[in-house]
């Protein structure tokens, strides 16, 4: 009878796969968002914002041909929205390579920046008196 019970337990283990030695599959990897840009409501209306909620801006002197002209001292006030090495374009969001070989995000081929003057999510203090910097807004 003991032998019959042992055979039955072994058969049940085989039937359920428990005796195969398989471990549970690891949980799926958490994927980081493909594009670290979201929409945010501010006192100036709906804007594009980075993952922290900081308003994004674009520069009139950047042409829309995948080039940033804000280098050197300019980046002390206007911080490029950095793209990871493995970042991929998605829809209206593209990745451009800067003159220093770093990568940054662009929206509709316009490079995106945050402003040093914005200190909290939703701030829109980055507009300049020369009207060269503009708040980036989602397309309608």
Regions found by a protein language model. Give the residues of each.
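Compact beta-sheet-dominated domain cores in extracellular/mature segments
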Residues: 3, 20-140
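Bacterial N-terminal signal peptides
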Residues: 5-16
